[in-house]
């Protein structure tokens, strides 16, 4: 069968740096090819070349699509050829309806008069293809992330797509939403539509792919049939070494109780009769890693937001730090009590995107660098920034580079560096490795182990059960705002955690 896509000897440079170095790949119609590699490996750059974001002339090499040389000057030209890309950050206009988004820039009509009836029927057909049952007039802002993802795919299908590029499509989706998306991709494959799938979730890569292509440091390491590769094989090719144990677990001493929470309740910020956290009580000891598991909406994030003083609604309950009653209504109060937090949404709550990497790291500890007359000690601040970047292995060309320009993994490590400058006794990590590559995950896991060896208590929330089980000494399981189980992590399985989350009993301990 002739190839639908051939990329031959593609090289893309930024100055003297080769982001993509002589990469070639092929893809047949109806195939799914997964691209794997650490952040900064060149995956996204290669796809931007393919999709016309980097126009012909800005790179070396040749692209052949459907038997013809592709010389796209912009993304519109590649879309006209049948190539579409869906980014992790969705490109929908939230204030507009599903229908308006689907036809944005390609509206149907004559003489300046829109044919809304025809567009409505077409929109319904495209939504049916992705098995999404919503009214086309529904504002996108009223849809969940999984539904928005399907609208993006329907929008691509409306443009007669033949090759769909999906960049981290499930990073913010629940397990059920992910399952729906993977089913849609299988259906597209059965209809002859090819897909290039980029993801750090190797279980998904294995499940959905026909072939897996690994890129490292801008170079093509290898492409193999997915059926011949294990997750360990993929990891070894991605990082250039074998990770003997993804979740390194160093021996550490668990000490006395440092945190106790009693009868914590939190109400929905808008629908104030709804409890998001319902009578939650638990404790945490020095040097302990406490995992909190549960489905999305179970109350995990709301619980730790209360502990850090950032929950947006009304809440009540008793919090004790080292046996003393604590008042926490602001994050400043929490930090003074020795609590630091890496938030769930790093781009929204964890960084100031336009500020430099260094300025973000020291932002919460500026008092430590302030001398006489409230003047900032620049030399002292810069020294601490250099130490923090080295300790957390943050990869950046300059501490003054805007943090938004770093990869997700390096942004997360910079946020951790900011937290550690506070010398916390309790560190809360909400989805600490979401959307980051396997190498950066491993470094964060090692850091967590180092911190608990120093006696710091750590709370980890993750939607990835293997991560919770791989890191935690003890696991709290939450469901509908309540703690359903408090489990010692000894031979604990994913099945047992999910059973605890869904059972009818109010509380289980082990």
From Swiss-Prot:
Gene3D superfamilies recorded: P-loop containing nucleotide triphosphate hydrolases
Residues that coordinate or bind ATP: 37-44
Subcellular location: Cell inner membrane
Pfam families assigned: ABC_tran
Disulfide bonds: none
Enzyme class: translocase
Family annotation (InterPro entries): AAA+_ATPase (IPR003593), ABC_carbohydrate_import_ATPase (IPR050107), ABC_transporter-like_ATP-bd (IPR003439), ABC_transporter-like_CS (IPR017871), ABC_transptr_XylG (IPR013455), P-loop_NTPase (IPR027417)
EC number: 7.5.2.10
Reactions the enzyme catalyzes: D-xylose(out) + ATP + H2O = D-xylose(in) + ADP + phosphate + H(+)
Entry keywords, A to Z: ATP-binding, Cell inner membrane, Cell membrane, Membrane, Nucleotide-binding, Repeat, Sugar transport, Translocase, Transport
Domain of life: Bacteria
Membrane-protein topology: Peripheral membrane protein
CDD domains associated with the record: ABC_Carb_Monos_I, ABC_Carb_Monos_II
Keyword Nucleotide-binding on entry: yes
Domain ABC transporter: 5-242, 259-505
Main location: membrane
One GO MF term: ATP hydrolysis activity
GO CC annotations, alphabetized: plasma membrane
Record-stated family: Belongs to the ABC transporter superfamily. Xylose importer (TC 3.A.1.2.4) family.
Annotated function: Part of the ABC transporter complex XylFGH involved in xylose import. Responsible for energy coupling to the transport system.
Quaternary structure (record): The complex is composed of two ATP-binding proteins (XylG), two transmembrane proteins (XylH) and a solute-binding protein (XylF).
NCBIfam families: PRK13549.1, xylG
Protein name as it appears in the record: Xylose import ATP-binding protein XylG
């Amino acid at each position: 069968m002739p190839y639908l896509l051939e990329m031959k000897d593609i090289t893309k440079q930024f100055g003297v740096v080769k982001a993509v170095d002589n990469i070639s790949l092929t893809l047949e119609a109806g195939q799914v090819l997964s691209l794997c590699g650490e952040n900064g490996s060149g995956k996204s750059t290669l796809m931007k070349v393919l999709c016309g974001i980097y126009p012909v002339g800005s790179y070396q090499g040749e692209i052949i699509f459907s038997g013809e040389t592709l010389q796209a000057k912009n993304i519109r030209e590649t879309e006209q050829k049948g190539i579409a890309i869906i980014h992790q950050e969705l490109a929908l206009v939230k204030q507009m309806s599903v229908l308006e988004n689907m036809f944005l820039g390609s509206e149907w009509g004559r003489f300046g008069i829109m044919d809304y009836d025809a567009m409505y029927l077409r929109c319904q057909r495209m939504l049916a293809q992705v098995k999404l049952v919503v009214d086309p007039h529904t504002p996108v802002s009223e849809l969940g992330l999984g539904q928005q993802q399907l609208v993006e795919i329907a929008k691509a299908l409306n443009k007669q797509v033949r090759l769909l590029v999906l960049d981290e499509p499930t990073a913010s989706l629940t397990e059920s939403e992910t399952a729906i998306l993977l089913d849609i991709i299988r259906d597209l494959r059965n209809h002859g539509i090819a897909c290039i799938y980029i993801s750090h979730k190797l279980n998904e890569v294995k499940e959905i792919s026909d072939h897996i292509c690994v890129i490292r440091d801008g170079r093509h390491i290898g492409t193999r049939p997915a059926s011949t590769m294990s997750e360990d094989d993929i990891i070894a090719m991605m990082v250039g070494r074998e990770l003997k144990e993804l979740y390194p677990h160093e021996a550490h001493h668990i000490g006395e109780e440092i945190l106790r929470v009693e009868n914590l309740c939190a109400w929905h910020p808008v629908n104030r009769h709804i409890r998001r956290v319902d009578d939650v009580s638990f404790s945490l000891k020095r040097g302990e890693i406490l995992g909190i598991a549960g489905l999305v909406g179970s109350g995990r994030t709301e619980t730790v937001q209360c502990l850090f003083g950032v929950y947006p609604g009304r809440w009540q309950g008793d919090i004790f730090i080292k046996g003393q009653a604590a008042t926490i209504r602001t994050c400043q109060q929490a930090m003074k009590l020795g609590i630091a937090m890496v938030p769930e949404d790093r781009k929204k709550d964890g960084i100031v995107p336009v500020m430099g990497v260094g300025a973000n790291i020291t932002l919460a500890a500026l008092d430590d660098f302030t001398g006489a007359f409230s003047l900032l000690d620049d030399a002292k601040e810069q020294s601490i920034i250099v130490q923090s970047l080295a300790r957390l292995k943050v990869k950046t060309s300059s501490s003054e580079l805007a943090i938004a320009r770093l990869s997700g993994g390096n942004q997360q490590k910079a946020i951790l560096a900011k937290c550690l400058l506070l010398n916390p006794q309790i560190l809360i990590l909400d989805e600490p490795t979401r959307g980051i590559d396997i190498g950066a995950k491993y470094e964060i896991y090692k850091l967590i182990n180092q911190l608990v060896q120093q006696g710091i208590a750590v709370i980890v929330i993750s939607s990835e059960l293997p991560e919770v089980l791989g890191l935690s000494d003890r696991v709290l399981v939450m469901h509908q705002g309540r703690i359903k189980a408090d489990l010692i992590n000894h031979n604990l399985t994913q099945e047992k955690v999910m059973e605890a989350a869904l059972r009818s009993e109010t509380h289980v301990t082990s």
